[in-house]
Structures are given as C-alpha cells and as structure tokens.
Design a protein with these regions (language model features):
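Positively charged n-region of N-terminal signal peptides that target proteins for export
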Residues: 1-4, 8
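Hydrophobic core
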Residues: 9, 13-17
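Loop/turn elements at helix/coil->beta-strand transitions in domains of secreted/extracellular proteins
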Residues: 36-40, 66-71, 90-95, 113-116, ...
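Extracytoplasmic/periplasmic substrate-binding proteins
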Residues: 45-54, 158-173, 180-186, 220-276, ...
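Carboxylate/His-rich catalytic cores and anion/metal-binding grooves
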Residues: 113-142, 197-201, 209-243, 299-323
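Helix-loop-helix "hinge/cap" segment bordering the ligand-binding cleft or interdomain interface
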Residues: 119, 148-149, 153-225, 244-295, ...
Length: 538
C-alpha cells in the first residue's frame, strides 16, 4: 500500500511540475539605496511572540543590508480592529501595515485611495511580477474587484509539499495496542468501525478494570481535531454542516445535501451507543489533550494534525521519533469506505497568506519601498523570514539551505521568534523545500518528505477531493451581505447539527423544514454569492 501511495504521489508531482512553473526570483543588488531611508510600520505579531521587531536580529541585519530602516509599532491583536478604524479615520497613516489588514479592510481602504495600488509599481518588483505570472492561484487571491493589488502575500509551499496541491489538515489515529490485545484489525469501513469501537468500549482494553475507555474522541469546534473528513467523508461529502463543498462545479454547504442526513444518522448511532466521547461536541483542545496525556490510555481513536499534541510524542511516534516502526501506541489509519462505496477526504487551499504587507498611498518614495518589499521574496530573505536568521537557525549550503532544529530543551516556536516575526512577505517554493534538509539536535539529517506530517499526508492524500473552494476575493457588496447573513446562519447550523448528532431530535424527519428555515435566513443568497465568485474565476 505504501509503495502504491508513493507511486501516486510521484505521478502527482510530475503532473504538478508540468502544470505550474516555478517563479523566477533573485537576490537584488544591495544596498537598495545609498542614502538611508526611514519608514514606519504597524504590525500584528504571532500569538506567542512577545518580542520587539525593532530588536529582532534578522530585521536589524536587513536594515544594515538594504539601507531601508523600519520603525515597528506592535499592535495587539485584541485591539487590531479598533486600531485599524481609528488610524484610517485620523488620516495619519503609517507607511506600512504588516499582518494587519484583511480583505475587507483592503477593499475598503484600497478602493478609497488610502492604500497604494502595488500593481502600479510592478516594474520595480521583478520577483513579485514573476510570482503573479507563474502562480495564477496567488494572483487570483490578491487581486481586488477593481483589478488592482493592494496587499503582498506570504507564500509558503512547505505546507503543501510535495506540491501536488493536496493540503491535509487532519489525520486519524487508533490505539494499536488495544487492537492487538483484542485481536482486531484496523477498520476500513463504517461497519467495521462500529465493531471496533464497541470492543474498545466493552472489553476493557486498557486493563485497569474500570470502564473509562473513550472509544472515539474529537473536538467539534477545533481545527485539525474535527471529524469533517473522517465521519462525513464515507457518505460522500465533507462536513460539518457549515463546510462549503464543491462538486461538479456546484457550490453547496454540507447540510444542504441529503448525504449529510445519512452521515448524521451514523454519528448519532455512535453517540447513542456511547462510542463517542461525551465531551466531543463541547470540549476545547486543552481538555482534549489532558485526557490524551493521561498515563493510562483512555482514547481508542482520536483526530489531530500529527498526534503528538494529543497523546505525546512517545505514544504518537515512539521513542525513535519515526512513524509506524513498531514502538508507538497509536498508528494512523486510512479514510473509511461508507455503505455506498464513498471514500473521500478533505482538501483545501493552503500556502497563501494574503495582505501580509500593505503600503499607505501617502508613503514617500513608493518606488523604493516597493523594491524593498520585493526583496523580501528573494530566496535567502524568505528562508530567514520563516525559519530564522543564518548562523543560528539556518545555514547556507552549496545546494541551498539547511534548517537547524531547535535544541531539545527549548520551545521551538519561541526560539525561532527571537530572530523574526515570521509575518512579512516571503516565497518558499516546492523546489526550495525539496532541497531544504533539517539538522536535528542529535545530529541526524532529515528531509521534509521524512517528516511525520508528510508521511501522514501520504495516507489520506490519494482520497482528497479534487474540487474545493479556492481563495477568492468577494466584492465589497458581497462582503457586506455575507457579514450580515452568515453568522446567525452558521450558529443555527451548528446548534441543530449538534442536537441531531447527540439525539436531540430526528434528523431525517426534521431536516427538510430546517433547510427551509435556513433559506428564509438567507442561506441560498450566501451560496449564490460564493457560486458567482467561483464562476468568475473560470
């Protein structure tokens, strides 16, 4: 099976390489100006970043290299929206906004003339111009309805390596020791899943004489811990209720499809038999992790990005840190096949973070600041922006770069943020990732393809849907309508879905009337907005 998956991925890589050319980016001649130039910027930092960008080693070195000095002001994310409103209302704008504005802000302030139309300065931006020419998805994501570009993106193909466009957020793990103790096989169908979960519940697989086993757990309101693919995919859709699906070019929410009813009936069966964690629909990740990290195994199956956050490294990948080598407690499983032969997994756009840098229209010497911004896309700058300054965090090699992993006794994210905010524009392509090994603390080397998440993705990627809703830019009018309609509709969806899954109501009997009530709230208008936006990209 593993060889087959590897072959499929290899074919997809070849297809991807044929379909999309890599951007041509290069390091500009430094300094960018012989006369030092000063600019000021507002920036919103990563949640755990408490440092001062003015003191980060990469940014200090960048100023010395380019001749462009940036005075950074950190804006707390908790007051971000308020600060945006008051800043633009005052008319006293900083030169730059970093990781500060969303598409709605860019639409409002770009089309009003407060933001610089970067698309008018592409002659000074050869790197970004090449990105637009070779990456149509990026161009679509950053171009506003007036045809102009006001924000520069961060593009990181590390998350979709090896570049076949398959982004795998969730993986499902099963307790291998419990399977072996009970003489069970890994389930491959929904029927087999029920039998395995029943055995986990009834036969005391953790051996403590207490009925404390949790056959299946997840976090309904989570991120990678959600059951959107695992429990809905076998019925031919990607849930949950509020998940936007695309099939044969048609846009719809999961809850609008009759297959959603069958999926919820299945989930309700699991719930009624006590096979789903009683807290699955209400717990947060902190509670989810706490149960998984108990010394005695409680989870029979769980859903996560890579497993270690939930049950710890040793149980997820074993002492050797490698997947499926025999000493781990939990192993990943492939998507299940449903009663009608359906077997699909989610896919979604990833790797492009828009509006990482916007420029005020009042900026002095816009040509220079555009050249400075374009230099951020150069390979050396991009690698350092995302993974730290050369010397401590990275090393240059003859073939490219070598990433240095964090020491074992420090928090890797906090360590990395000592030199960079990781928030500015950057470009990491598939070609760059392919020749970017990591040197680990024990001295061994590993490629991206060796990492746990890539191995997990190999298991689910062959089942990933080919159609999914892309990054699109809605018009100002469409954004306004979505802002008015969507929140109450989504809240109603979630409340009713959870009720049906947990036995508070009959989904089969109540579903038609509930869809009518959603339509009366404007659901069909929301779908039409997204359908029209998708059609406009073709």
């Amino acid at each position: 099976m593993k060889k087959l998956v590897a072959l499929l991925l290899a074919v997809l890589m070849v297809m991807s390489a044929a379909a999309f050319a890599e951007p041509v980016v290069s390091e500009p001649e430094m300094p960018l100006t012989d006369t030092p130039a000063n600019y000021d910027a507002m920036i919103v930092l990563h949640g755990m970043d408490v440092g001062d960008p003015n003191e980060k080693s990469l940014y200090v070195a960048r100023e010395e290299q380019t001749g462009v000095n940036i005075e950074w002001t950190v804006i707390p994310s908790t007051s971000q929206a308020e600060r945006i409103a008051t800043t633009f209302a005052s008319g006293e704008l900083p030169d730059l906004f970093a990781n500060m504005l969303n598409n709605s802000d860019v639409l409002t302030y770009g089309m009003s003339g407060a933001l610089l139309p970067i698309s008018g300065y592409l002659e000074y931006m050869p790197n970004f111009s090449s990105i637009l020419e070779t990456m149509p998805d990026v161009k679509a994501a950053v171009t506003m309805p007036d045809g102009k570009i006001y924000g520069l993106p961060q593009i990181n193909m590390w998350s979709v390596w090896p570049g076949n466009g398959v982004y795998q957020r969730s993986s499902v793990f099963i307790n291998k020791n419990w399977l072996e103790k009970l003489g069970l096989e890994v389930p491959t169908t929904t029927d087999e899943l029920i039998e395995v979960l029943r055995a986990f519940k009834e036969q005391d697989p953790n051996g403590n004489g207490i009925a404390d086993e949790i056959p299946l757990s997840f976090v309904y309101n989570g991120w990678s811990e959600i059951p959107a693919s695992f429990l809905y995919g076998p019925f031919g859709i990607i849930g949950m209720s509020y998940q936007l699906n695309v099939q044969d070019g048609k846009v719809f929410y999961a809850i609008q499809d009759e297959r959603f009813v069958e999926a919820v009936k299945f989930i309700n069966t699991l719930w009624n038999e006590g096979l789903i964690d009683s807290e699955a629909f209400t717990q947060d990740t902190k509670r989810y992790y706490a149960k998984g990290l108990e010394e005695t195994d409680l989870y029979g199956m769980f859903i996560d990005w890579a497993g270690s956050s939930v049950v710890g490294n040793e149980k997820a990948v074993g002492a050797d840190g490698l997947l499926n080598t025999g000493d781990e407690t939990y192993i990943p499983i492939a998507p299940l096949t449903g009663p009608n032969g359906d077997c699909i997994w989610s896919n979604e756009p990833a790797g492009v973070n828009t509006n990482r840098l916007c420029i005020a229209s009042t900026v002095e010497n816009p040509e220079l600041i555009c050249r400075w911004a374009d230099a951020l896309y150069a390979p050396d700058s991009s690698i350092q922006e995302l993974w730290g300054q050369f010397g401590t965090y990275n090393e240059k090699t003859e073939d490219g770069w070598m990433r240095i992993a964090a020491p074992n006794d420090v928090n890797a994210d906090e360590w990395l943020l000592e030199s960079t905010t990781r928030q500015l524009p950057a470009l990491v392509t598939n070609e760059m990732v392919a020749k970017y090994p990591t040197k680990f603390a024990d001295g061994h080397m590993g490629m991206k393809s060796d990492e746990i998440k890539c191995q997990l993705a190999e298991i689910t990627a062959p089942y990933a849907v080919k159609e999914y809703y892309p990054n699109v830019v809605l018009s100002a009018e469409a954004n306004e309508r979505i802002a008015v309609l969507w929140t109450p509709i989504k809240n109603a969806m979630i409340e009713q879905e959870v009720a049906w899954c947990t036995g508070e109501g009959d989904v089969e009997a109540e579903w038609p009337a509930f869809i009518e009530s959603l339509n009366s709230m404007g659901l069909q208008e929301v779908v039409e907005i997204y359908q029209n936006a998708l059609d406009a990209t073709k």
